[in-house]
Amino acid sequence: MITSIELIDKFDLKFIAGNVAIEIPVANADISRPGLEMAGFFSHYSSDRIQILGTTEMSFFETLSKEERAERMVKLCRKETPCIILTRNIPAPQELIDACNRKGTPLLQSKEATTSLISKITSYLESELAPETTMHGVLVDVYGVGVLITGDSGVGKSETALELVKRGHRLVADDNVEIKEVSRNVLMGKAPKLIEHLLEIRGLGIINVMTLFGAGSVLPEKRLMLNINLETWNKDKVYDRIGLIEEKLSILDSQITKKTIPVRPGRNLAVIIEVAAMNYRLNKMGTNTAKDFNERQNEQIRRQSIKEI
């Protein structure tokens, strides 16, 4: 739960009036600039949002009569309003101080410009209030691609991650990956604090990757882009040999590209994942080798058919 106290510490805000001890939760990442409300229109007032008062709002406020000022500020302060913030160190008018003290709404002050403060608070709230879940797997940064390695227990996820780290890539999380959906199809993954930088290898135990390989071998968080699902080789299953099958892994309300890699003795999984990551980047740049091959093959078949006719 995010409250005004956390915002004070995070954004260097100054407490002016109200009751900061009242823990009114910030449940909405959107920020409101109550311009129409200053003019007296409260029909669609988003009272559950953080209210930001800048130079424009306060300049208009100065044109109001004394009675109108008091009335507008009382209406602005609601029990569900997390806080009201004055930007650019604008002095708080007495009407606003009285209304905040009466209703208990925290009144804060910032030295930052209005647009800059709104941008920073919005980014922070979107990250903190984003839907989240946890998944069993390993998250590794491979050539700048966030690769989530999944599969049954004992299939070799951690061992593969260790080989990738040894080859110069960076570990984000092992065994338990905390995932947040910061926006549509944008998933950020990180490790729980308890197991940050740790890797569990059967027969060896728990190792600290940062201590063994250095600070450059770990990453605090990474966007999930590609899922590599490891599974024991099944001779009765037909695996994709060309690359035309487009699988997707759904996490929360987002999807990422998925590749299923069969595991059997002699396969170098680390190299395969490296190539998968590079191929993913190549596809995003507009080059799809599988589709190009398929088109050339179809063209050759078409030409052969014409010759036979």
Swiss-Prot record:
| Source domain of life | Bacteria
Q: Which family does it belong to?
A: Belongs to the HPrK/P family.
Query: Among its keywords, does the record have Transport?
Result: no
Gene3D superfamilies found in the cross-reference section: HprK N-terminal domain-like, P-loop containing nucleotide triphosphate hydrolases
Instruction: List the GO molecular function terms.
Output: ATP binding; magnesium ion binding; phosphorelay sensor kinase activity; protein serine/threonine kinase activity; protein serine/threonine/tyrosine kinase activity
Give the miscellaneous note: Both phosphorylation and phosphorolysis are carried out by the same active site and suggest a common mechanism for both reactions.
What's the protein called, per UniProt? Answer: HPr kinase/phosphorylase
Q: Where does ATP bind?
A: G151, D152, S153, G154, V155, G156, K157, S158
Going by the record, the broad EC class of this enzyme is: transferase
Q: SUPFAM superfamilies, alphabetically?
A: HprK N-terminal domain-like, PEP carboxykinase-like
Keywords, comma-separated and alphabetical: ATP-binding, Carbohydrate metabolism, Kinase, Magnesium, Metal-binding, Multifunctional enzyme, Nucleotide-binding, Serine/threonine-protein kinase, Transferase
Q: Which EC numbers does the record give? A: 2.7.11.-, 2.7.4.-
**What segment(s) does the record annotate as region Important for the catalytic mechanism of dephosphorylation?**
262-267
Name of the gene this protein is made from: hprK
What role does this protein play? Answer: Catalyzes the ATP- as well as the pyrophosphate-dependent phosphorylation of a specific serine residue in HPr, a phosphocarrier protein of the phosphoenolpyruvate-dependent sugar phosphotransferase system (PTS). HprK/P also catalyzes the pyrophosphate-producing, inorganic phosphate-dependent dephosphorylation (phosphorolysis) of seryl-phosphorylated HPr (P-Ser-HPr).
Checking Pfam families in the record gives: Hpr_kinase_C, Hpr_kinase_N
